[in-house]
C-alpha cells in the first residue's frame, strides 16, 4: 500500500491513474513508498504533457535500487551536490530527457570529448601527401554517422550520458526520492520547493539539508 492515500482532481479521485503511471515502469510498492508526493505529481504531469518519459526516469531509480529491468544505467554515476549550499547533503542521478535539447547537449559533449577521427585522418593524410582532399557526399555521410550515431552510442556505453536530475537523499541505508530538476534550475528555488513539499513527509530531511545562513 502506497503512503500516498488519495489524489483528487476536483471531485474526481485520480489516485489510481497517477500511481499507475509510475508502477507500470516496474517501480514496486516498497520503492514507491519512498517517493515524495512532489515527485509523484512531477512524473505524472510530465507524462500527461508529454514533456518527459516516466520509463527513463524510473529506470534510473530502479538502477539506484539495484533492480534494473532492462540493463544498467547509461547516465553518469550518482553524485552529491557540493558546489552551492542550497542542496548540499542531497544527491542527484541523471536521467536522459526527451526531445532535441537533451540530445543536442549529449552530442555536443561527445563531440568535445571524442572529436571527429574520420575528418582528422583526412586532414593528416592531406598534410602528409600534400594533396588537397575535397570532401565528398560520402565523406559527409561518414562524418555525420560518426558524430551522431557512433559518438552517441559510445557515450551511452561509457555511462557518460547527461540529462536532467533525480534529486534524492539517503536515510538509514535507503534512498528517498524527492524531486526532479534541471541544470538550468535555480538551486535556491529547488531547495525551497523541496523543503516546503517534502519535509513534512520525510521529517529526517531537516537534519540532512545544510543549514543556510540567516
Task: Go through the PLM ranges and name each one.
Residues 1-163, 175-176, 183-214:
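Basic, Lys/Arg-enriched alpha-helical interface segments
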Residues 166-167:
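Hydrophobic/aromatic beta-strand elements that line small-molecule binding cavities or substrate pockets
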Residues 170-178:
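Active-site beta-strand-loop-beta-strand hairpin of nuclease catalytic cores
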Amino acid at each position: 500500500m502506497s503512503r500516498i492515500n488519495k489524489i483528487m482532481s476536483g471531485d474526481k479521485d485520480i489516485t489510481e491513474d497517477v500511481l499507475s503511471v509510475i508502477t507500470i515502469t516496474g517501480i514496486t510498492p516498497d520503492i514507491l513508498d519512498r517517493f515524495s508526493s512532489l515527485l509523484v505529481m512531477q512524473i505524472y504531469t510530465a507524462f500527461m504533457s508529454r514533456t518527459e518519459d516516466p520509463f527513463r526516469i524510473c529506470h534510473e531509480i530502479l538502477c539506484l535500487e539495484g533492480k534494473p529491468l532492462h540493463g544498467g544505467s547509461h547516465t553518469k554515476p550518482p553524485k552529491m551536490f557540493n558546489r552551492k549550499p542550497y542542496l548540499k547533503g542531497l544527491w542527484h542521478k541523471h536521467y536522459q530527457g526527451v526531445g532535441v535539447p537533451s540530445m543536442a547537449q549529449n552530442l555536443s559533449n561527445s563531440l568535445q570529448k571524442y572529436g571527429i577521427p574520420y575528418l582528422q585522418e583526412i586532414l593528416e593524410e592531406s598534410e602528409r601527401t600534400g594533396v588537397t582532399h575535397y570532401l565528398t557526399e560520402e565523406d559527409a555521410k561518414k562524418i555525420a554517422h560518426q558524430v551522431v550515431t557512433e559518438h552517441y552510442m559510445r557515450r551511452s556505453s561509457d555511462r557518460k550520458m547527461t540529462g536532467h536530475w533525480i534529486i534524492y537523499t539517503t536515510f538509514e541505508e535507503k534512498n528517498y526520492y524527492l524531486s526532479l530538476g534541471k541544470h538550468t534550475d535555480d538551486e535556491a528555488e529547488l531547495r525551497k520547493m523541496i523543503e516546503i513539499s517534502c519535509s513534512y513527509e520525510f521529517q529526517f530531511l531537516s537534519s540532512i539539508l545544510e543549514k543556510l545562513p540567516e
